[in-house]
């Protein structure tokens, strides 16, 4: 999980970070969520979205932080329109 991560801002005020892809256009990341037992294979961008959604959700619940809740739903709205929506939702479910 090292390397360079890029920050993306969304038109709706949301934001996420994603690992910079290698030169290989077909690069995929395999994520496993031990909390729900789900596994998904996705692009670096989708992996970043999923990782940020899980992080925002964790902090929103644990810290009862309204700002994190807002960030979560802004990014989730974006993720629902993403071409890899199914994989993202499977891993965060």
Spans of model-derived segments:
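Amphipathic, interaction-prone secondary-structure segments
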Residues: 1-26
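Polybasic, proline/glycine-rich intrinsically disordered low-complexity segments
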Residues: 24-93
